[in-house]
């Protein structure tokens, strides 16, 4: 039927007869001669319906409209002088129609597929039409290339591709599970996996040594621009390894994928301890495409006559006072703008935001009256201020200060337009805390199967659980967490201790994780691994701001598929088979 894709038709084929197929991108009638731009996945080619060559083809071309599906046969000829289109691969030739078939017609389009300003809801309701755009096809071609390279690299390194179950057991991994009711076991539920974590560990216990999977994962969590309820990750696990071994594999994999996709990236990445990332950048996923570190000034502010600062500075363990220098900020932002920045940080828990302006005769601003000349000079010194700079200050509980000052750092950089768009800055964040305590509850920062640094910490004799470090690592790219992993617990007694420290009783541990504890008692090897978020990786490679652009049929931020109207109600008979009854809540008006 088809002999060539549209962009395969070049000057080399002049004089030959070809058959192409695709969609009408545009149609133009020039005084009895009709020009059609035909589009397929490769691009565009111009068709010409001329009555001197084929009246039948012209008659059909007169009825053609945008997005009709055509099969066209004709002879390739060079375009006339001055008629070439340098913006097209096929811009030097055209196809003179000898036969034209309308394979299918199209209703008028609800939107222009190349108009990026179209309402998201309209595009998602007609996602199959949006996917016709060149931008969409290029993204999925990139995704396919990256996925194939991932498989090839891991295969070359001796990893075995193994599929793990989709219907599994509900276990606490942080987010809520998607539950699937069982018809056979009334009142019981499967859970869709948040990750293949436990199964890949069991494969290491089984002796598979090296495993990988392009895995579908599901999490019922609040959505944002870089999250979806179902997502894909490149999942990797290996036996008899340490952190260095795992990082080498991950760097090789990332390097190969990015190189295959035409990006120039280093083969090894810099590293930073979690504590340094939080103190210097207020984030465990810092964007290092620009500098602007946070500077600790709590000792200087301890001397302040401002009672609030002085009180905060008394507790250096739990509080922070951070300075953020804005280069040439005094010439970029007005006083009104600088005052408005306080509204921004208040959204993230800040109680205020102070600032100094560096003038020719020293620091100026409403806070200077609370400091001695010596302390003001010290602020200039530690923040390396020059005339025209502005320095902002955040003070309070350390986690709150880290969060809002880290966000403010990114906000300022974008306001100043100093973030290079075409740079790729990778970073390993290492030595994460094993636990975090919130509202009196102890949670694993990564997951409870991560190996704590037992060589450095005695789990039986520790007062502050948040001091315990784990052998965990995240890979960050341009301020986005691309993935992460850890060395796993491979001894049953350590896993039981971790559960106990988290407040999980022996009975609960046995009920939820008995299969894992059993497996660890049968000679489990040391093992570790990582997972890379494929969707996020493609989002960064493609330079798009939304993860929805890189998923063929994505959900909205309300976890709905507008195309298929999922989730949807099911009939009573189906519910009855599943022993489920929907309880309707009546709200009094």
Curated annotation (Swiss-Prot):
Residues annotated to bind L-aspartate: 173, 219, 446, 488
Taxonomic superkingdom: Bacteria
EC number: 6.1.1.23
Compartment(s): Cytoplasm
SUPFAM superfamilies to which the protein is assigned, alphabetical: Class II aaRS and biotin synthetases (SSF55681), GAD domain-like (SSF55261), Nucleic acid-binding proteins (SSF50249)
Cellular compartments per GO CC: cytoplasm
GO biological process, one term: aspartyl-tRNA aminoacylation
Leading EC class: ligase
Descriptive protein name: Aspartate--tRNA(Asp/Asn) ligase
Source organism: Aliarcobacter butzleri (strain RM4018) (Arcobacter butzleri)
């Amino acid at each position: 039927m088809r002999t060539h894709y549209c962009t395969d038709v070049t000057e080399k084929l002049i004089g030959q007869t070809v058959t192409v197929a695709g969609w009408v991108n545009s149609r133009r009638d020039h005084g009895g001669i009709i020009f059609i731009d035909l589009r397929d996945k490769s691009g565009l080619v111009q068709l010409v319906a001329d009555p001197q060559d084929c009246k039948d083809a012209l008659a059909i071309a007169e009825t053609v409209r945008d997005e009709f599906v055509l099969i066209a046969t004709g002879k390739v000829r060079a375009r006339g002088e001055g008629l070439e289109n340098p913006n097209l691969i096929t811009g030097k030739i055209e196809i003179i129609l000898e036969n034209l078939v309308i394979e299918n017609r199209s209703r008028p389009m609800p939107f222009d597929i190349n108009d990026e300003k179209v309402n998201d809801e309209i595009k998602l309701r007609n996602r199959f039409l949006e996917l016709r755009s060149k931008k969409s096809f290029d993204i999925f071609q990139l995704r396919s290339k990256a996925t194939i390279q991932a498989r090839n690299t891991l295969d070359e390194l001796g990893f075995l591709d193994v599929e793990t179950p989709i219907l599994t057991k509900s276990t606490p991994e942080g987010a809520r599970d998607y539950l699937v009711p069982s018809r056979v076991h009334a009142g019981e539920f499967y859970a869709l996996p948040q990750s293949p974590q436990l199964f890949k560990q069991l494969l290491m216990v089984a002796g598979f040594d090296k495993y990988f999977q392009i895995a579908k994962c599901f999490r019922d969590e609040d959505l944002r621009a870089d999250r979806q309820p179902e997502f894909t990750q490149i999942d990797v696990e290996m036996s008899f390894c340490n952190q260095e071994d795992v990082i080498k594999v991950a760097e090789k994999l990332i390097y190969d994928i990015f190189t295959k996709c035409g990006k120039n990236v280093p083969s090894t990445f810099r590293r930073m301890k979690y504590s340094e990332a939080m103190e210097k950048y207020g984030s465990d996923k810092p964007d290092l495409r620009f500098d602007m570190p946070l500077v600790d000034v709590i000792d200087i502010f301890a001397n302040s006559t401002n009672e609030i600062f002085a009180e905060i500075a008394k507790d250096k363990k739990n509080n922070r006072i951070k300075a953020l220098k804005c280069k040439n900020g005094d010439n970029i932002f007005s006083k009104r703008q600088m005052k408005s920045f306080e509204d921004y940080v208040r959204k993230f828990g800040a109680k205020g935001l102070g600032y100094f302006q560096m003038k020719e005769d020293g620091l100026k601003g409403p806070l200077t009256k609370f400091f001695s000349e010596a302390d003001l000079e010290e602020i200039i010194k530690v923040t390396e201020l020059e005339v025209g700079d502005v320095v902002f200050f955040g003070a309070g509980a350390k986690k709150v200060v880290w969060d809002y000052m880290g966000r403010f750092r990114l906000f300022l950089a974008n306001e100043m337009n100093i973030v290079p768009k075409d740079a790729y800055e990778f970073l390993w964040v290492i030595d994460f805390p094993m636990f975090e305590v919130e509202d009196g509850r102890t949670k694993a920062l990564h997951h409870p199967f991560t190996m704590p640094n037992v060589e450095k910490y005695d789990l039986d004799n520790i007062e502050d659980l948040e001091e315990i470090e784990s052998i965990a690592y995240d890979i960050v790219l341009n301020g986005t967490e691309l993935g992460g992993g850890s060395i796993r617990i491979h001894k049953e007694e350590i896993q039981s201790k971790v559960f106990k420290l988290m407040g999980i009783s022996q009975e609960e541990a046995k009920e939820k994780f008995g299969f894992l504890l059993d497996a660890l008692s049968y000679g489990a090897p040391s093992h570790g691994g990582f997972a890379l978020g494929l969707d996020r990786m493609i989002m960064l490679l493609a330079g798009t701001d939304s993860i929805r652009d890189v998923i063929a049929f994505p959900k909205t931020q309300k976890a709905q598929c507008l195309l298929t109207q999922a989730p949807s109600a099911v009939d009573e008979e189906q519910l009855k088979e599943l022993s489920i009854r929907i309880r309707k809540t009546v709200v009094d008006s």
